[in-house]
Amino acid sequence: MYAVVAMKYRDDCVTLELDTGESILLPASDVTGLSIRVGSTISREGYDMMKEESRRFQCKRAAFDYLAIRPRTVSEMERYLTRKGFDVDMIRGTVEDLARSGYLNDEDYAARYIGARLRKKLVGRNLLAAELQRRGVSRHVISHALKVAGAQTAAIDEVYGLALKKYNSLGPAKNRVSKIASFLRGRGFDFDTITAVVERLRSEQGCEEDE
């Protein structure tokens, strides 16, 4: 048997201090429902159940703290909770609960990420896809999000304007066309888009590869 020797309340949780010197963190609602107070005794079975519930509560709290910084993908959350030392089953249950409640949604995350990224800077689908893949979003979800956002194909006029600005900034430097192509690849534009822009530069600016 275990005896509760002290109870410390903070926000939505209670820390039970036992006569063994151990502390158990629980949701305040659980403690109220179990009618636990200082002097209460807890059986071994009850202790094990409380330990499990405490771990589950701490896992969910850690998840919400992580989400408070910014939205996360399912994969990011799983990796974070793993680093925090929670076991696989605990993480799976927590992630499933968060997904059911709408706190984790890779489709919504991808759509918002793409929209925010494009508002900040003109980039291509390859870069967007690579960034989302690093965050653990599946290829299927990424492809759908790019399509919905209209980012599957870049607007040639916009990319050309970006390339022309870069081209002019290079001044009389050699191999400006190659540098432009490399610049556009770094921005994540696909081969067809880069080819079209480079050809337009050659046509409208009269530039050659060996200049």
Residue ranges and their predicted role:
Residues 1-211:
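An alpha-helical, amphipathic repeat domain used for nucleic-acid recognition
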